[in-house]
Amino acid sequence: LRDVRGDDVDAYVRMRCDPVMMGDLGGPLPREGIDDKVRRDVRRAAADVDWIKMIVPDAAAPDVVAGTVTLWSHDDGGGGGAVTEIGWMVLPEFQGRGLGGLAVRTLLEQARDDGRWGVVHAFPATGNGPSNAICRSLGFRFVGKCPVTFADRVLRTNHWTVDPGRDLTRR
């Protein structure tokens, strides 16, 4: 994993503007605004506000990106305060290799060692078998089905939680 960089715009476009990649997230996002999104993400990662990591399958080729995994805090929208959420995307040509699960586990291990994130929530689409399998395999607890608003769209998701300090076993 490496922090997002300003030259990751093409990877963002491939992930966020593609109808297949965004199928479970309500459809592709418009290309306009992606450059600004990358700049914001670079700033937030550099400030250590959010952990926005690019999945790099080969450290010798850091420009080859397989996807992204992100850990961030936000208001739960229901008056319950801040929650920590994790999300990930893996490009089609890299799917099925275990990279998503490894990236999520690695970021959760870093969160455990850092100690500031607390319980982590994940909201994969109800029909996203691979992402729900990652949650199961890493010890997330299934909370239930949950509507989530993303980019002005209401998504049908499964709500999972994990406490990295308690639920992750050391490798």
Regions found by a protein language model. Name each.
Residues 1-93, 109-110, 114, 141-144, ...:
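GNAT-family acyltransferases
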Residues 24, 102, 119-120, 143:
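A local structural micro-motif
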Residues 83, 100, 124:
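Charged, low-complexity surface patches
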Residues 114-123:
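Conserved GNAT acetyl-CoA-binding A-motif
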Residues 124, 131, 143:
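Short histidine
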